[in-house]
C-alpha cells in the first residue's frame, strides 16, 4: 500500500483504521466474514482495467482472451461446488442477481411471493421499499408466532389462493432449515417458478451440511461473501438450459454492462478455496459455534427466536430485558463486539430501533475460534445486555474482547 500512502494519505489512513478495527473487534454480523488475502489480491489486480461486455467467447470488446479464462474458471468451479449445470458469475451483488430473475421471468404487475421482511426475509423479496415491491404484486408469507418457524401450510394456502408466478424462498434472518423440496412442490401446483435465495447459507450448502436448493428450485441465487467467504458479489445457478439463457440475457444486456473481471477472478479464488476439504471442516465449526453461542445465551436467560439455530446465525429477542436492538448494538460495539439490530417476527418496534439483534458465527470461526471462545463471547454479551448502562462493565468486557482477538489474529503480516 506504499502507493496509496504516498498519493492519498486520507484513504491510506482510513485503511489503517479499518484494518485495526477488524483486527481488534469480535465480528458477529451474520452477513460478514474475513476474506483470504488471496481473494483480496485477485480483487485488487490489473483485471480491474479490463472491460468485457458479454460472455466468454462472445465479447463486445477485443483483448478478452485472458479474462475469458478467469470467468470460465469461476463458472466451472461454481458449477462443481454446487452441483449445478449452469452458473452466471457476473452479478455485481446478490440484490442484482435477484432482480435479474424478476427481469428474466416476469412482467411488471405479476404476482410474487416471499418471506416478509419483518419476519426475516430480504428487501429484494418484495419489500415495498425495493423495486421488487414497487413493480410487482407482492404476497408475503410469515413464520409461526408460536414456533418462529416457516409455516408451510400458510405458504401452500396463499399460493393456491393468489397463484403467484414466482415464489421466493430464503432469508436474511431465519436460522432454521428450509424445506426447499416442499416449496418446489407447492410451486408446481400453480405452475409457478421457485427461486431460492441461499445467500446466507451458501457456504454451509457448499460444504454439504445444510440442504441444497439447487436440485429443487428452478433458480438459485446467492452472494459470494457471507458464509462463502469470497468477495462481495452475486451468483446465479440453475439446471435448466432455457432458464440459463434467459438469465444470461437479463444480466447482460438487461441489467448490467461490463462485468467486474477483478471481482470475478476473486470469486474464482473463493470457489477454489471452498472446494478444498478444509472448507467443510470450517463450515462444521461455523455451525457448531453458532449453536454454542445460542445455547450459552439461552442459559443466560436470553430468548432465542425459534429456540435455536440450524445454521450460522440466529435472532435474540431482547424484549424480556427491556432493551432495544439499537441500544444493544451501540453498547456492544463499545464493548468490542459488532453485530446488528434486527427486527424479530411480530415486532412492534420501528426498524430503526427493533426489539432484537442478529448474531452470526462465520467471521469469528475464520479467526480459528471454537466452542470455548463462543462461551466467553456469549457470556460477555449477557454481561453487557444485563448491565447496559454500566460503563465500568462495558470497559472491562472491551478489554477482554481485545485480548481474545489478539489470541486469534487475522491478516498476519498485512500492513497498510
Curated annotation (Swiss-Prot):
One of its GO terms (biological process) is tetrahydrofolate interconversion. It is an enzyme of class 2 (transferase). The keyword Transferase applies. Its cofactor is pyridoxal 5'-phosphate. Signal peptide: none annotated. It is found in: Cytoplasm. This is Serine hydroxymethyltransferase.
Amino acid at each position: 500500500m506504499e502507493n496509496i500512502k504516498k498519493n492519498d494519505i486520507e484513504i491510506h489512513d482510513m485503511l489503517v483504521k479499518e484494518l485495526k478495527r477488524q483486527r481488534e473487534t469480535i465480528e458477529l454480523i451474520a452477513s460478514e466474514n474475513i476474506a483470504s488475502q488471496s481473494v483480496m489480491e485477485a480483487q485488487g489486480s490489473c483485471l480491474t482495467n479490463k472491460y468485457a461486455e458479454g460472455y466468454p467467447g462472445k465479447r463486445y470488446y477485443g483483448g478478452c482472451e485472458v479474462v475469458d479464462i478467469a470467468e470460465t474458471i469461476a463458472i466451472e468451479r461454481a458449477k462443481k461446488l454446487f452441483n449445478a449445470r449452469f452458473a452466471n458469475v457476473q452479478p455485481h451483488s446478490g440484490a442484482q442477481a435477484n432482480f435479474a430473475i424478476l427481469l428474466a421471468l416476469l412482467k411488471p404487475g405479476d404476482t410474487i411471493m416471499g418471506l416478509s421482511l419483518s419476519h426475516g426475509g430480504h428487501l429484494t423479496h418484495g419489500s415495498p421499499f425495493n423495486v421488487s415491491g414497487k413493480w410487482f404484486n407482492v404476497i408475503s408469507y410469515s413464520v409461526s408466532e408460536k414456533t418462529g418457524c416457516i409455516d408451510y401450510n400458510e405458504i401452500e394456502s396463499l399460493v393456491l389462493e393468489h397463484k403467484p408466478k414466482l415464489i421466493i424462498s430464503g432469508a436474511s434472518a431465519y436460522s432454521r432449515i428450509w424445506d426447499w423440496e416442499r416449496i418446489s412442490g407447492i410451486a408446481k401446483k400453480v405452475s409457478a417458478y421457485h427461486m431460492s435465495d441461499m445467500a446466507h447459507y451458501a457456504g454451509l450448502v457448499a460444504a454439504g451440511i445444510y440442504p441444497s436448493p439447487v436440485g429443487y428450485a428452478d433458480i438459485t441465487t446467492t452472494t459470494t461473501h457471507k458464509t462463502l467467504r469470497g468477495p462481495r458479489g452475486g451468483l446465479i445457478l440453475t439446471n435448466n438450459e432455457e432458464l440459463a439463457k434467459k438469465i444470461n440475457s437479463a444480466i447482460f444486456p438487461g441489467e448490467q454492462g461490463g462485468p467486474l473481471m477483478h471481482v470475478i477472478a476473486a470469486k474464482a479464488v473463493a470457489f477454489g478455496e471452498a472446494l478444498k476439504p478444509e472448507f467443510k471442516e470450517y463450515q462444521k465449526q461455523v455451525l457448531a459455534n453458532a449453536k454454542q453461542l445460542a445455547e450459552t445465551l439461552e442459559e443466560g436467560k436470553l430468548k432465542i427466536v425459534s429456540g435455536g439455530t440450524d445454521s450460522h446465525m440466529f435472532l435474540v429477542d431482547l424484549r424480556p430485558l427491556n432493551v432495544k436492538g439499537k441500544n444493544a448494538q451501540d453498547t456492544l460495539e463499545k464493548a468490542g463486539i459488532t453485530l446488528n439490530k434486527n427486527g424479530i417476527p411480530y415486532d412492534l418496534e420501528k426498524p430503526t430501533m427493533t426489539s432484537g439483534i442478529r448474531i452470526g458465527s462465520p467471521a469469528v470461526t475464520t479467526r480459528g475460534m471454537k466452542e470455548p471462545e463462543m462461551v466467553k463471547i456469549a457470556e460477555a454479551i449477557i454481561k453487557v445486555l444485563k448491565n447496559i448502562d454500566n460503563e465500568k462493565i462495558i470497559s472491562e468486557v472491551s478489554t477482554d474482547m481485545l485480548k481474545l482477538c489478539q489470541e486469534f489474529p487475522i491478516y498476519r503480516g498485512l500492513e497498510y
